[in-house]
């Protein structure tokens, strides 16, 4: 009797994994196609209405995808890729999604030829690694002291935004902000040291950089307290200067006016004691954290503080505490017994200023050794939509400069690096054998989606432009790309259309990793 042959049903149904892969690729590509029109300086903007009824107008890839109601789990992976690009490079969030979509299209064509998805994924990874090497060969080294080059890179980032007409003003502002908090030896920049403060009123031209700290809260003047302090000693407190309340709900029954008088006297003595301890520590500017349980500071305490000539700013948000303690060099104080002079920050000047119809408190000349260099940028605009988009654009420009601190190399923009990588990979693929040659060829073709999209969005003939670029790169003109200003191809490096090399290397690496993850999925199971 012959032995029973084990069942091989798992591998008999080959259609299901193919269908799942096809559905995943279609879902992911539909997301890429949705934001493809917003790439480049002539790219369109998207208007998004949030579930809360807010209106957002933006052409920042990450912002658009983050707000879109995407249900398909694989399509959500593209949102995560965009978020990863945003945190790694800050710019190129649209490019990375378009590139992922194009690589998935190439993978679909290869799958239809019967090539195994794991082989495709691994070859894409090796092609991406080679692409990064080519980009690093192409890049022009840049020094942080070369301010002009940094400004040009920031201007290129701003050129595709609504605020592009203000790029000559915002780009130097972004460069100066980053250079203030970094030095020639820095390998990274913490953008949390740059505080973007949004204030409605005025125009984008009124946006200013302040070397110090800006508070959106105003000084309290109701009790006649000061609004300007020179040689300031700043205290940041997290307790309330108001009568204490018990934790449990209870009532106090007063049946004699003398008892009432005693309660009021105790209250005065309690508050006066706190105010005297603050004055004893030589504090003359007091920042008080917002409280939801009771008044952060009551009228009687304000009266005492104004008599002691102490400037008071209340309602400091919990999220601001870390930045303020870092920027002012003061330590947050949670109890009056811990209020000592060594926990205070010091500054040359703290003053409330009137800026375009709204008041802000400005702290300049911070002189504490514990303080890290911080910069505040006050963003102005006619309405919240413009201010929000200006903030996003400025964040992208700051990220571009941060990229140049991390990896000090600039490459030409306008699709020039993608065309060059495509040409070099195609050439190398011809000398390969077997399936890998096919896959590298498809990877090279997929990279041309960036210059093609730039040309289409600029209203140019994409086939003619990309063919022209190919022949120019074949003749050794490595920096030739698409210039929207000239409505054709030109040396984009000489036209000052520049981008950090880290933006492109990060986009290609992340796109190939995402494609690898998607191709390796052969089934979707829903848990209960």
Curated annotation (Swiss-Prot):
Keywords: ATP-binding, Chaperone, Cytoplasm, Nucleotide-binding
Record bears the keyword Cytoplasm: yes
Location of the protein in the cell: Cytoplasm
One Gene Ontology CC term in the entry: chaperonin-containing T-complex
Main location: cytoplasm
GO BP terms, alphabetized: chaperone mediated protein folding independent of cofactor; protein folding
Any Pfam family the entry gives: Cpn60_TCP1
GO terms assigned for molecular function: ATP binding; ATP hydrolysis activity; ATP-dependent protein folding chaperone; unfolded protein binding
Subunit structure: Heterooligomeric complex of about 850 to 900 kDa that forms two stacked rings, 12 to 16 nm in diameter.
Family membership: Belongs to the TCP-1 chaperonin family.
Function in brief: Molecular chaperone; assists the folding of proteins upon ATP hydrolysis. Known to play a role, in vitro, in the folding of actin and tubulin. In yeast may play a role in mitotic spindle formation.
PANTHER family associated with the record: CHAPERONIN (PTHR11353)
Record's protein name: T-complex protein 1 subunit delta
Record organism: Saccharomyces cerevisiae (strain ATCC 204508 / S288c)
């Amino acid at each position: 009797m012959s032995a029973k042959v084990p069942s091989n049903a798992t591998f008999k149904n080959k259609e299901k994994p193919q269908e799942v892969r096809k559905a995943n690729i279609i879902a992911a590509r539909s997301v890429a196609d949705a934001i493809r029109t917003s790439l480049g300086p002539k790219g369109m903007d998207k208007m998004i209405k949030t579930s809360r009824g807010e209106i957002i107008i933006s052409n920042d890839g990450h912002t658009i995808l983050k707000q879109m109601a995407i249900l398909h789990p694989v399509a959500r992976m593209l949102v995560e890729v965009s978020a990863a690009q945003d945190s790694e490079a800050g710019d190129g969030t649209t490019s990375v999604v378009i590139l992922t979509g194009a690589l998935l299209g190439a993978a679909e064509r290869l799958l239809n030829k019967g090539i195994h998805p794991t082989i495709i994924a691994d070859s894409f990874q090796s092609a991406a690694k080679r692409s990064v090497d080519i980009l690093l060969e192409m890049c022009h080294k840049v020094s942080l002291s070369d301010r002009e080059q940094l400004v040009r890179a920031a201007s290129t980032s701003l050129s595709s935004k609504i605020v592009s007409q203000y790029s000559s003003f915002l780009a130097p502002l972004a460069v100066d902000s980053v250079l203030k908090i970094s030095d020639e030896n820095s390998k990274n920049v913490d953008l949390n040291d740059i505080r973007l403060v949004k204030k409605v009123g005025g125009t984008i031209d009124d946006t200013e950089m302040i070397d110090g700290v800006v508070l959106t809260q105003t000084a309290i003047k109701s009790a006649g307290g000061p609004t300007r302090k020179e040689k300031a000693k700043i205290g940041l407190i997290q307790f309330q200067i108001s009568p204490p309340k018990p934790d449990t709900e209870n009532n106090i029954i007063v049946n004699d006016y003398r008892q009432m008088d005693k309660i009021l006297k105790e209250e005065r003595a309690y508050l006066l004691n706190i105010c005297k301890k603050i004055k004893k520590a030589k504090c003359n500017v007091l920042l008080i954290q917002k409280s939801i349980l009771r008044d952060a500071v009551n009228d009687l305490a304000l009266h005492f503080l104004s008599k002691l000539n102490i400037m008071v700013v209340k309602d400091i948000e919990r999220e601001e505490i870390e930045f303020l303690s870092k920027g002012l060099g003061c330590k947050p104080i949670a109890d009056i017994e811990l209020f000592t002079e060594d926990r205070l920050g010091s500054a040359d000047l703290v003053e409330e200023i009137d800026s375009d119809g709204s008041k802000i408190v400005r702290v300049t000349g911070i002189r504490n050794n514990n303080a890290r260099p911080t910069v505040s940028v006050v963003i102005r605009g006619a309405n919240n939509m413009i201010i929000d988009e200006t903030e996003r654009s400025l964040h992208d420009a700051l990220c571009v400069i941060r990229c140049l601190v991390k990896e000090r190399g600039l490459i030409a923009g306008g699709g020039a690096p993608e065309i060059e990588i495509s040409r070099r990979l195609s050439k190398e693929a011809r000398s390969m054998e077997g399936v890998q040659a096919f896959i590298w060829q498809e990877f090279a073709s997929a990279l041309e989606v960036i210059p093609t999209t730039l040309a289409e969005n600029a209203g140019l003939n994409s086939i003619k432009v990309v063919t022209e670029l190919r022949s120019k790169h074949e003749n050794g003109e490595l920096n030739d790309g698409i210039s929207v200003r000239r409505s054709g191809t030109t040396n984009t490096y000489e036209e000052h259309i520049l981008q950090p090399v880290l933006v492109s290397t990060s986009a290609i690496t992340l796109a190939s990793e995402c494609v690898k993850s998607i191709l390796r999925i052969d089934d979707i199971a829903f848990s209960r």
